[in-house]
Amino acid sequence: PGGKSINAALKMSEQGDCGRVIARDLSDYKVALIDENIKRLNITNIQTQVYDALDCDESLINKADIVIADLPCSGLGIIGRKPDIKYNASPEKLQSLVDLQRDILKVVSRYVKSGGVLMYSTCTINRAENEDNADWICKELGFTKDGEYHQLLPANNSGMDGFFVARLIKN
């Protein structure tokens, strides 16, 4: 956990003192793992918080240049590493995840300032969680697609995971 946030913090520190990263997760355990990596890598421009993404942090509204929304998903892109995922998937569970993702997106999209970037990512290959959600963000939350969506499909025996990322600009 925290790989995208840590990478963002490292990239920012390479460019000088140009900002800070707030890495949040609902799980104490995952935040502790992120903290271990931050300490190991001696990163100073990142702060971790145990935080429920469904709770709006009023102090961050319209403040962020970039928000990376790496949301809970069905994980269908990592089924090669976690084959038990296929036994837990159902149309109802998938729809429930889409609903949760959209509820979180309604909150975190508010943190992005006008002209800022929302990076939406998942580790699934499910269209409803990916392209459909990204299109919904543009239609319902006032964002514009910036380039093409990127979907990586896991290839047979490649060891690669499937994932999705969309770069969206706030109007």
Which residue ranges define each predicted feature?
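Conserved hydrophobic residues forming the short capping helix/wall of the S-adenosyl-L-methionine
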Residues: 12, 38-39, 138-141
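Conserved P-loop NTPase nucleotide-binding/switch module
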Residues: 75-87, 123
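S-adenosyl-L-methionine
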Residues: 24-62
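Helix-to-beta-strand junctions that scaffold the AdoMet/dcAdoMet cofactor pocket
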Residues: 13-16, 43, 112-114
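Glycine-rich S-adenosyl-L-methionine
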Residues: 24-33, 85-112
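Short beta-strand element of Class I
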Residues: 16-24
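Conserved SAM-binding loop of SAM-dependent methyltransferases across substrates and taxa
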Residues: 1-16
